[in-house]
Curated annotation (Swiss-Prot):
Disulfide bonds: none annotated. Red blood cells. Keywords: Heme, Iron, Metal-binding, Oxygen transport, Transport. It comes from the Eukaryota. The gene is HBA. Residues 1-141 form the Globin domain. Pfam families: Globin. Heterotetramer of two alpha chains and two beta chains. The keyword rRNA processing does not apply. Transmembrane segments: none annotated. Gene3D superfamilies: Globins. This is Hemoglobin subunit alpha. Belongs to the globin family.
Length: 141
């Protein structure tokens, strides 16, 4: 459960990310594909090489989903309901991949915003990314 402080920290981090969110999403995907190559199996039709147009486009979707969740942090489940349906019913992504991508996103944020990612902010962002992952896997059966 995200505390009031967690919510404030997450909103602060996303305000600092600003217009770079799409790039962060793509960089997180690139990092995930290299660090956890088994995740590429869900993207057989993608050019998963760093900087590819497809990775950038999907990174934009990832960033959009995370930004949507941050903007509706008091009701992440409702804000990501359609994405949850898509991932559970159509794409059938292994739920562990949300955790892996979340870890990669956290690393990207840390690389680009080291002063903003205090230990407290780090913990809050990690809790937020876990909450997003839980929402995205809630409709799995």
């Amino acid at each position: 459960v995200l505390s009031g402080t967690d919510k404030t920290n997450v909103k602060s981090i996303f305000s600092k990310i600003g217009g770079q969110a799409d790039d962060y999403g793509a960089e997180a995907l690139e990092r995930m594909f290299v660090t956890y190559p088994q995740t590429k199996t869900y993207f057989p039709h993608f050019d998963v090489s760093p900087g590819s147009a497809q990775v950038k486009a999907h990174g934009k979707k990832v960033a959009g989903g995370l930004s949507e969740a941050a903007n509706h942090i008091d009701d992440i489940a409702t804000s990501l309901s359609k994405l949850s349906d898509l991932h559970a019913q159509k794409l059938r992504v292994d739920p562990v991949n949300f955790k892996l991508l979340g870890q990669c996103f956290l690393v990207v944020v840390a690389i680009h915003n080291p002063s903003a990612l205090t230990p407290e902010a780090h913990a809050s962002l990690d809790k937020f990314l876990c909450a997003v992952g839980l929402v995205l896997t809630a409709k799995y059966r």
